[in-house]
Amino acid sequence: MLTRHQKLRLADALLERYPDEVITGYVVNARIVSACLVGKVYQAWGYAQGERLVSGAITRIIQYERRWLIETTEGDCLAIVSFAPGGRRSLLHLTALFETAALAHSRWCLH
């Protein structure tokens, strides 16, 4: 069950536009576990509203002004609505790993 604050943040995220991306789901209480995005997903094909999501491996992280977008090996582009405790730290850790990988010319990238 979403709190009132989470509902407002989700509504705000649903109204935002990303001209270069097609959002396939909105994730609440997000965190990164083993290079996958975990949380409750909304407005995602094949998932019930609020169903637990474990994404495919993350291939790209995009930071917009107010929101993080996550692309996966499955072709999903997921918008993070809110973080679970420690979730932002886990994303920033993965971001640092992607930056290091870019120096080594790896296929993983950050935008």
Feature map (PLM): residue ranges:
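N-terminal non-globular leader segments, chiefly Sec-dependent signal peptides
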Residues: M1-T59, F98-H111
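Short, compact, well-ordered microdomains
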Residues: R60-L110
